Amino acid sequence: MFGEGSRDNATLSKEGLFDKLEIGIASDITIRDKWSCGEIKKPETINYRTFKPEKGGLFCEKIFGPTKDWECCCGKYKKIKHKGIVCDRCGVEVTLSKVRRERMAHIELAVPIVHIWFFKTTPSRIGNVLGMTASDLERIIYYEEYVVIDPGKTDLNKKQLLNDAQYREVVEKWGKDAFVAKMGGEAIYDLLKSEDLQSLLKELKDRLRKTKSQQARMKLAKRLKIIEGFVSSSNHPEWMVLKSVPVVPPDLRPLVPLDGGRFATSDLNDLYRRVINRNNRLKAILRLKTPEVIVRNEKRMLQEAVDALFDNGRHGHPVMGAGNRPLKSLSEMLKGKNGRFRQNLLGKRVDYSGRSVIIVGPELKFNQCGLPKEMALELFEPFIIKRLKDQGSVYTIRSAKKMIQRGAPEVWDVLEEIIKGHPVLLNRAPTLHRLGIQAFEPVLIEGKAIRVHPLVCAAFNADFDGDQMAVHVPLSIEAQLEAKVLMMAPDNIFLPSSGKPVATPSKDMTLGIYYLMADPTYFPEDHGGKIKIFRDVTEVLRALYTGGFLDERINNRCDETGRGIHIHEKIKVRIDGQIIETTPGRVLFNRIVPKELGFQNYSMPSKRISELILQCYKKVGLEATVRFLDDLKDLGFIQATKAAISMGLKDVRIPEIKSEILKEAYDKVAVVKKQYDDGIITDGERHSKTISIWTEVSELLSDALYVEISKQAKSKHNPLFLMIDSGARGNKSQLKQLGALRGLMAKPNGAIIESPITSNFREGLTVLEYSISSHGARKGLADTALKTADSGYLTRRLVDVAQDVIITEKDCGTLNHIEISAIRQGSEELLPLKDRIYGRTVSEDIYQPGDKSKLLAKNGDVVTSAQAELIDDAGIESIKIRSTLTCESRRGVCAKCYGLNLANGRLIGLGEAVGIIAAQSIGEPGTQLTMRTFHLGGIAATSSTPEIVTDNDGILVYMDLRVVVGQDGNHLVLNKKGAIHVVRDEGRSLEEYKKLLSTKSIESLETYPVELGVKILVGDGEKVSSGQRIAEVELHNIPIICDKPGFVKYEDLVEGISTEKVVNKNTGLVELIVKQHRGELHPQIAIYSDAGLTELVGTYAIPSGAIISVEENQKVDPGMLLARLPRGAIKTKDITGGLPRVAELVEARKPEDAADIAKIDGVVDFKGIQKNKRILVVRDEITGMEEEHLIPLTKHLIVQRGDNVMKGQQLTDGLVVPHEILEICGVRELQKYLVNEVQEVYRLQGVDINDKHIEIIVRQMLQKVRITDPGDTTLLFGEEVNKKEFYEENRRTEEDGGKPAQAVPVLLGITKASLGTESFISAASFQDTTRVLTDAACSSKTDYLLGFKENVIMGHMIPGGTGFDTHKRIKQYLEKEQEDLVFDFESESECAC
């Protein structure tokens, strides 16, 4: 029913491909005359004896064409010579049988039937056109009630519903001919046909103008949009009612014979059969003048049969087939993973491909892969046949195939020849990023397994425990050229997500190199000898391998055994005119290092190898880097073999201090237990403190063990230390479990079990410890299975939202920018500025601070790594850069705003699919992380820092802090958003320091953000020295501290209602706890200046769950604890929390228990309590403006009366709602918030993703605006439109002298943004297929095929990469005389030119 002239309205481009596609509602005439080749009258399919299609049935050859090529049904005409003849006996046209895939038919319906999509898909199109509710429509369509079509002389209203009794009453009163009332599809058809859309449109516009109610306006605007769609398109509303049903070609719903005389059939045949049977029965009934009740029932059944055909289960119970399974309707054919879109159009199976298990191929070069001979023979068969024919070895294809099967010697020679220079693609599923498919030169090998180079394993995430890979052969010259130039493994040695090398040695290779480059362990002076000095590298190698020396004078200094030198001996050697102190191992390693990098004279853990590869690429280019990588691989394997490093049980040392530390910990836990028993602390605090004690023990023992095995390494390498320190395998956490203790474990629900596993794997676990241990291990495995699916779905949504972001131009010329600075946590720099600005375009000139003559980077420069270093070293805090968030390209983004392509360090090229790269960069580590949880076996990973210690000498300065001096003379912090700074002692006054810090004129040595309740041990402006404790952090409670002296009075702390006394079972001590209640009580502690409680000096709201620490009428001093709110048990931090957090951010969901944020800058005040909510007011003292916040009493406030707050600052605990940031702080702040929050999740797991990828996703989430005032434009109130469309419409209106529209930016989640894309084909293939198609058809949408997805679906070349317009124009076509060389692969260079 869709696609009125879809192909007719499409414009054909030069290559015969259409460049746009229009969808519409098909009219009755279109179905009958344009699509159909005949009417189906019988429900029969095939004859049970002859197995031939029945005439006039669902497989009729007369309608659909012959079942055999060039043969009619009765056999009168056979062979191609009768082409085009229609047989006079059976009426079948003599043609190809494949027409049965194209020819459609139709079923002529006895009564009009409503198309289910148009009234059941929300919003109901028919309901909106007629202005009727869905339930009313349903009663009419399913023959329950009549609807008045023409009231005539009666007092009825048009569209009024009448039940049977009312209808009879009206007929009796006025007579049958006085009015028209009908039911079913016929009634809807008449109503739709009589609807005057133009006047309805005018009326709706008038109502929209007059209506003030926001909700009514939204409702009207939605209806108006649907009506406008019909008016502006060529669709007629009555086409939503069918008079004939189109029938799908028979080869798309086949009937396949099975063994044993049974048949397998498509569900569609059953559904069509039901429709035909009911339709034929209804026709017969109507001819017989049957009673109305029976006719009505039959009509309803026909409506239901057609409903089931189009969308089974949408109305009523689904129609079941054999085995009680719902039948698959036409809608199901399109929907979901196995629907037409995703199964057949976006993903296709390809020929010329094979699959096999992979094994390691250490002998291969970086650009090679080993291909089993048998597989290659099969894959390259057509090429072999052509070459054999060209050589004259065979003359027919059949004889060539026989020759191949025989395995004749010339076949192998030809095969060797053909695969030279013919790359193949290797792919490992799941293909999480573009490095999952790479091209290699095949090398023929024996056996049946594919061989893979060890260094590409990281990119494929492959190992050799049974992994399989698929091989694909690029056939055309263009495909081969692309594979060779763009996809070869040596071109893919850097990650597109971060620019870090991905092809770095790992495991054995790292171990071998680390062993070779280890610090000297043999010192000749310790053995009474002298350091040997060598003339050059050759001499060192000769001494190392043969034990001989070129010079007799050196021979005298040979070691006692006379065997030359040890690989880790300290020696001196002359290199490039300089004498260097090094080891023979390092000399050996430096033979493979490119000269330009200089002599590498330090140990080589994996991190440093990675840096060396990056440096190598920057200095000497790709070719030399790839050679260096291959040499690294060979050297690494050789040295690992020679070193013969293996681990023994004795190598796992148990720290001597273990028993002592454990005893101490048990004592501390006992103290905490005693405090709980005495009622000093709550159960939650006891739990938190216990866990902190064990976490500290864990870290202490882990460090002690590491020190112990590394100490031992000075004289002799401990293999365990070698493996961990080199980065080859294992980490400190695993070492801790082997030699110290397993530590705290988590329950399956994430809570931490209090008693840790104090044994380690060397000692062995007790039965109880083993069972606790298995908890964690199982949780890890279960999580992995579940989260992999989540992560895959996230990647899919990300790809969908960003798929059409491509680089469309060099420079958009924008003046907009974003500002970025280093990311810090306290005084620690998590991500330096240089890493954030590398590869980005600066949008202002950057000078050396204080020296305008020294230009570090020019406006419009793309920052190189050298420039980034200079800018960072100059101490510049933040710089302005261009970003995809501010790019003004009309479609896609520009190269300047994007910056460098991280995969090759060059400016990004036109046509690059940066959106998909961004989606893969964010999605791929998500999957990696979920797969990585179980490696720690569910160990609780918590962090605790109960104190702040300074590393510098200087002056301590408080910034934005409200403090009170406690009884012990220490300063207690009363607000949340403050910090303490350690600054260099320059002899200034405290005020000067504060002023300079606030204007960023001086930089602090250390900065520590401090929370409410932190105890600062040093006064403001006092001197501190390195190693001094400057503050203590309360980890377990949020304290409520008194800041004024006075006497306590409880307010609304009513026992049994707002508070309860809890008796500690162990001690009998009573604790007063504030509980949640529904009454009008608002628990608070008031402080009065006098014992008579007459003058109020302050009130403190007490949240539920808090434990009150003071008694009524008690005298209190500043700094005293009034109450404490336990922070609750610590849950383990894991990406399990991280992945849903990323999804929550990119889907723009409102977080549970969201925080309130300040809407204006001002001072906090409280205005009492109303309906169980506290009224918090932020007052701007300059303008007098006030903003009220109603905050539930159960929420914990993090501000107090008198605090200064900034716009957007949190007032209560919890996560911030992104939509509120947008509304209050604007688009820039929201963009910054989203990018930083997503980065935070990945940073916690040590995953490096460049900001630009997240920025692209955020850009896609913010591409729409909501109309607040349509002005004189054609836009509607409340409508969400694309920014570009909005600006374009406003420009047109202003040119015509009209008033432009006003709008506010909208934040959409990625799913919603994907469905809101301009291309209906892309949206339909993502989700909600039926709704998207219905929507598009009603307004006759046109898809201009601009994105990737829609082009893949239509079978066109994608408009990206080499398919991008600019590149397509460059493509040269082969001349006629060269055409025969296309498959002559030796002449590849001639063709490629």
Curated annotation (Swiss-Prot):
UniProt cross-references to Pfam families, sorted A to Z: RNA_pol_Rpb1_1, RNA_pol_Rpb1_2, RNA_pol_Rpb1_3, RNA_pol_Rpb1_4, RNA_pol_Rpb1_5
Gene Ontology cellular component list: DNA-directed RNA polymerase complex
Cofactor(s) needed for function: Mg(2+); Zn(2+)
Biological processes, Gene Ontology terms: DNA-templated transcription
Annotated residues for binding of Zn(2+) 1: 72, 74, 87, 90
Family from the record: Belongs to the RNA polymerase beta' chain family.
Name listed for the protein in its UniProt record: DNA-directed RNA polymerase subunit beta'
